[in-house]
Amino acid sequence: MKRIVMIAAVGILMLPSPGNASPLADRVLKGKAISSDNMKGNCLACHAIQGAEMPGNLGPPLLQMKLRYPKRKVLHDQIWDATKKNPQSIMPPFGKHGILTDEEVNLVVDYMYSL
């Protein structure tokens, strides 16, 4: 009986605290903040995002991003410099022009993958 109680106690102690967000959840929130920041990503200026107010309609809607971009690097590269794949793209080359750092682009990718 003592052994069962001890195992249960250890199991309970190993559960994550409800007050602590997972590292991925934290990254998603940071990516969302960047994507809606007028001085940073500002994705809503051109793209529709489900649940967002006043979305743009110049670019494709940002949904099912994992299905559309199964390889993270492809989505990262699109955000970093969309003109590399399509020189006529109106999407700003966020990384190439120093609008976003590599880490900020990765945070936005984490957010996009959550959509």
Across the structure, where does each feature detected by a protein language model lie?
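Bacterial N-terminal signal peptides that target proteins for export
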Residues: 1-6
